[in-house]
Structures are given as structure tokens and as C-alpha cells.
């Protein structure tokens, strides 16, 4: 450890390489999201565009046919398409969603979806017909509401139609399951507003969003990271989130600035609950619990691992614990583990 600058008001007594876990007071605030989608006026159903045999296929327990043609033809008639609930799921591939498209359905979103069978009977569920092709390709200004999307670990949930940055995407009451990245990309940035969504069972839940707002959502049980922000993934607001049971870090931030996470709960990450490297972040009014549940390396068994950069930490509670069944590793070893040049301002925590 070196050059760690602590500016403190109310702070925890610390030990070498880490800080002990102590409870603090917490003032709860819950952000209330507003409805960002229009009414039903102007929507047309995809059903009349489906061959009757293909409608039966959508409602089977194992759909086999490509239904892309129906959505493509419906989009020629209107930019506002309704996907009615089905007993199975729709199968699409490479459907380009033009600027201004709004797709709407009605879905019950499973907490996790480890198999495509988990979305059967959940309503307006969609999967990819060809495992090598994305379900949709996005242009700017596209909105999805009430859809349960199930992909595969070789493709991302949001693919650019042009190969460049995708902007002004709105997602409400949607589920993203079994993608390489549920929302976002490792190669391009995406500007997106996310409200009341479930992002679960992907390799990475959310990646490289910029100028975005994410609220009232669950980011759960992703293989690696819940949220990963890399170089330049700046200027995001995360609020009222439940980020839990992600295999590595619930929140990973490297070389990114001007990000705020507030009024959220981060629980039972495999490694550090929050990993910060050469980044700037504000953490406000959050609970961090049981971090480092699968790590055998002490510095990774911590609520916050900061490796250079700046963090303002205000009104947080940290708690240790085991798995929900009382078994598993008691973690973490530290509240905060800091190395390299790090500047922390910690208050009321």
C-alpha cells in the first residue's frame, strides 16, 4: 500500500491492507421510475402476419420455425408492434429494428433462466432461431417493453445494425438471459435507459454503457460481472438496483469516470463486491453484503477493492455472511482493500 489519501469525517478504524466490517446507519431512498412508453394506440399485432401453422409453432413447447418474416413484414406497416403472449416463444434472427421502432409484449420475467425451458409459458418470450445470429439488430431510438429475451453465450443481447455506437435505446420490464452480454458490448458503447428489467444468467450482465440511466432492476447470477464499465464508459447513473450472486464482481469499473451508484443492494459476489481501478465513482446509500463468497485470495474477499483512483463513499452499510442456507464461506475478510494511489472520502459509513 502507498500514497493512500484519506479525507475523513466519520470513518472506520482500519487494519493493514484492509478495513474491518462495522455496521452503520442507513437512510433508505427508493427512486420511483416513470412510465416511458406510450399507450396501446397505434400498435399492431404480429399475429396476423404469422402463418397459422407458425402461430401454433410459437405456442408449442419446442418451437422450431423461423418467425422473422412476420416481424419484418409487420415493421413495413408500422413502427409499433405488439407481440402477444404465447405458450412457447417466438424465434427471430437478424431482424433489423429501424429507427423509432417500439416492440411491446407482456411477460413474467423469471429470476434466473439457465435453460430455454425456463422462459416457456412466461408470455411474450423471444429467442434466436440461429445460435450464430442475434435476435435483433438495433438502430438508434428503439424501445422494448415487456419482452423476455433468451439468447446464447456467443452473442450479445443488443447488436448494432451498423457496427457503431447505439444510442437512445429504452428498455422497460424486459428480461435478458443467457447472452454473452445482456445489455451492452465489449467493442462499442451503448446509450440506454433501463427500467424494471431483469438481467440474469448471462456471461456479463451489463457492459460499457455511457450517458445512461439504469433503475429499479435486478442484475443477478451472471457468470462473470454484474456490471462491467471499461475505458470511457462514463457518465452513468445506477439507482434502486439489486446486484447479486454474480460470479466475479457485482460492479467492475476500470478507467471510467463520473459514475454514480445509489440506493442499491449488492450481495454475495464471488470476488470483491465493487472493483475500482484508476476510476472515479460516487457510492451513496447502498448496502454491500457477503462479498467474496468464492474467493480464496484475501484481497479479493472484500466489499470494495480500490486499485488507484478516487471514490466518494457516503452512507453505506457493510455486512458479512454465508449463503442463504447458512452454508458456504463466511465473507468478506475486509470492508475496503486499497492499493496503489487511491483517494477516498468516506462519511457516515
Question: Model-flagged regions — what are they?
Answer:
Residues 1-20:
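N-terminal secretory signal peptides and thylakoid transit peptides that target proteins
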Residues 25-49:
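C-terminal segment of N-terminal export signals and the immediately downstream linker at the start
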Residues 41, 78, 86-87, 92, ...:
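Surface-exposed or flexible loop/turn and strand-edge residues in extracellular/cell-surface modules
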Residues 46-84, 96:
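Acidic Gly/Asp/Thr-rich repetitive segments characteristic of extracellular carbohydrate-active
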Residues 72-77, 89-104, 110-145, 150-168, ...:
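Extracellular beta-strand-rich solenoid/capping regions of secreted or surface-exposed proteins
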Residues 84, 98, 104-106, 145, ...:
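Feature marks extracellular polysaccharide-active and adherence modules
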Residues 92-93, 108, 112-117, 130-133, ...:
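Short glycine/acidic-rich loop motifs that flank beta-strands on beta-rich extracellular proteins
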Residues 124, 142, 166, 189-190, ...:
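Small-residue (G/S/T/A) turn/hinge positions that recur once per unit in extracellular repeat modules
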Amino acid at each position: 500500500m502507498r500514497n493512500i489519501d484519506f479525507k475523513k469525517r466519520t470513518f472506520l478504524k482500519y487494519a493493514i491492507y484492509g478495513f474491518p466490517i462495522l455496521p452503520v446507519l442507513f437512510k433508505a431512498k427508493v427512486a420511483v421510475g416513470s412510465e416511458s412508453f406510450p399507450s396501446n394506440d397505434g400498435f399492431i399485432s404480429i399475429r396476423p402476419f404469422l402463418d397459422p401453422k407458425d402461430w401454433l409453432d410459437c405456442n408449442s413447447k419446442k418451437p422450431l420455425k423461423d418467425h422473422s418474416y412476420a416481424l419484418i413484414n409487420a415493421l413495413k406497416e408500422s413502427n409499433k408492434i405488439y407481440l402477444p403472449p404465447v405458450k412457447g416463444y417466438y424465434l427471430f434472427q437478424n431482424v433489423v429494428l429501424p429507427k423509432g421502432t417500439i416492440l411491446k409484449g407482456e411477460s413474467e420475467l423469471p429470476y434466473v433462466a439457465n435453460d430455454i425451458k425456463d422462459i416457456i409459458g412466461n408470455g411474450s418470450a423471444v429467442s434466436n432461431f440461429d445460435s450464430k445470429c442475434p435476435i435483433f439488430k438495433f438502430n438508434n431510438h428503439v424501445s422494448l417493453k415487456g419482452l423476455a429475451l433468451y439468447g446464447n453465450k456467443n452473442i450479445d443481447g443488443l447488436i448494432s445494425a451498423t457496427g457503431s455506437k447505439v444510442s437512445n435505446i429504452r428498455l422497460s420490464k424486459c428480461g435478458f438471459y443467457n447472452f454473452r452480454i445482456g445489455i451492452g458490448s465489449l467493442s462499442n458503447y451503448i446509450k440506454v435507459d433501463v427500467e424494471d428489467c431483469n438481467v440474469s444468467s448471462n456471461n456479463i450482465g451489463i457492459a460499457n454503457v455511457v450517458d445512461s440511466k439504469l433503475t429499479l432492476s435486478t442484475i443477478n447470477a451472471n457468470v462473470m460481472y454484474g456490471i462491467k464499465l471499461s475505458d470511457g464508459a462514463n457518465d452513468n447513473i445506477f439507482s434502486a438496483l439489486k446486484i447479486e450472486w454474480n460470479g466475479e464482481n457485482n460492479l467492475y469499473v476500470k478507467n471510467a469516470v463520473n459514475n454514480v451508484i445509489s440506493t442499491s443492494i449488492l450481495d454475495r459476489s464471488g470476488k470483491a463486491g465493487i472493483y475500482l481501478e484508476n476510476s472515479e465513482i460516487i457510492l451513496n446509500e447502498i448496502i454491500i453484503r457477503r462479498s467474496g463468497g468464492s474467493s480464496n485470495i484475501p484481497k479479493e474477499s472484500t466489499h470494495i477493492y480500490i486499485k488507484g483512483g478516487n471514490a466518494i463513499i457516503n452512507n453505506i452499510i457493510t455486512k458479512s455472511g454465508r449463503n442463504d442456507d447458512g452454508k458456504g464461506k463466511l465473507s468478506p475478510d475486509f470492508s475496503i482493500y486499497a492499493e496503489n494511489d487511491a483517494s477516498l472520502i468516506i462519511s457516515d459509513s
